[in-house]
């Protein structure tokens, strides 16, 4: 079994059930795993506190039974995947509205449709931004894609399972951003060390995707096209050559929004993008689920042949893959990225 989570995206569950030796009638295996109809929950028993928590929920979309091996294979995707199958079928117009309000309203809109209610709850803060959007009824845009497009410029989002009075509930959650910042003065902030509580790690860096001067292209054509330029001049001081690139945001017609969006992109790529993967057990400090989650920033320390003088970075958790051990200990693979740079619009 394996299940994943990704920041502002959709994680996946894959698992196999051996039907040999179990009472499949009493367990209602066939009717209880119907694709497109059934929600699958993953419950984690925390060995530190002996409490149980829902750590993953999603829709079963595929199943396959192999009679030779008597094995049922199940594939599910996080609850956000359901909203890929929900369409904006009425024209919706938002003028100078908080983008977090727009996102929540779109979710509530589709939940209010006939047979659309899933019992979703909401944790949606206000932001300091505003946006103007029109979703035309003839486009039939998916609700998920509309929310994801909003998030690219303004916020993080997820559907998070939790317990409420003993009931399993899903909550649509927006963060500005999601996650808890690392603090050296907070003893609960997660620290990962190799050697130490990290079993292994991968450290790829992609210079081909780096840019320290980025041109943003917005709405319009020819001389009337909106443009902006974002620069991280600190990289030149650090010895990097000029690395230029351009990005297209043809649906952005506001100069301030184009400036902010281009700058955000630059800050993510001005240092060669680094996607670190670390493999850790669930049973050592920091403990799985209770001590770190998607969106958190954590400290990573490495001292080995590749970093003989030691490396100490603050990285953000953007992905998580959990492999519960069947014949060995549980393992968690965290995907982490560098903190954003501090460029400027010129």
Roles of regions detected by a PLM:
Residues 6, 13-15, 76, 91-121, ...:
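Amphipathic, non-transmembrane alpha-helical segments in extracytoplasmic/periplasmic proteins
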Residues 20, 63-65, 77-81, 177, ...:
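Solvent-exposed coil/turn segments that connect beta secondary-structure elements
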Residues 24-123, 339, 343:
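Surface-exposed cap/loop segments at beta↔alpha junctions
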Residues 55, 59-83, 120-210:
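Short beta-strand-centered interaction patches in the first periplasmic/extracellular domains
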Residues 145-148, 178-325, 341-345:
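Acidic, small/polar-enriched beta strand-loop surface segments
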């Amino acid at each position: 079994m394996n299940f994943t989570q990704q920041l502002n995206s959709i994680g996946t569950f894959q698992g196999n059930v051996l039907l040999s030796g179990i009472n499949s009638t009493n367990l209602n295996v066939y009717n209880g795993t119907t694709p497109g109809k059934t929600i699958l929950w993953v419950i984690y028993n925390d060995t530190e506190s002996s409490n149980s928590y829902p750590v993953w929920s999603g829709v079963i979309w595929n199943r396959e039974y192999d009679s030779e091996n008597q094995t049922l294979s199940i594939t599910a995707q996080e609850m956000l995947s359901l909203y890929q199958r929900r369409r904006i079928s009425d024209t919706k117009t938002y003028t100078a509205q908080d983008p977090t309000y727009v996102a929540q309203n779109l979710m509530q809109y589709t939940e209010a449709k006939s047979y659309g209610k899933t019992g979703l709850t909401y944790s949606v803060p206000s932001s300091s931004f505003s946006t103007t959007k029109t979703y035309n009824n003839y486009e039939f845009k998916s609700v998920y894609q509309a929310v994801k497009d909003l998030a690219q410029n303004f916020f993080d989002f997820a559907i998070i399972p939790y317990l409420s009075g003993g009931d399993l509930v899903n909550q649509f959650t927006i963060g500005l951003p999601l996650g808890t910042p690392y603090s050296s003065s907070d003893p609960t902030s997660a620290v990962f060390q190799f050697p130490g509580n990290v079993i292994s790690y991968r450290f790829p860096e992609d210079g081909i995707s780096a840019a320290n001067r980025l041109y943003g292209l917005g709405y319009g054509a020819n001389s009337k096209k909106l443009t902006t330029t974002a620069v991280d001049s600190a990289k030149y001081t650090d010895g990097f050559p000029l690395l230029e690139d351009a990005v297209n945001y043809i649906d952005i017609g506001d100069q301030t929004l184009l400036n902010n969006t281009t700058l955000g992109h630059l800050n993510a790529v001005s240092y060669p993008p680094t996607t670190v993967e670390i493999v850790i057990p669930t049973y050592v400090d920091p403990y799985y689920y209770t001590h770190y989650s998607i969106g958190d920033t954590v400290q990573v320390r490495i001292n080995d042949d590749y970093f003989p003088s030691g490396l100490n970075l603050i990285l953000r958790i953007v992905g998580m893959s959990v492999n519960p051990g069947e014949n060995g200990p549980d393992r968690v693979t965290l995907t982490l990225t560098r903190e954003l740079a501090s460029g400027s619009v010129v």
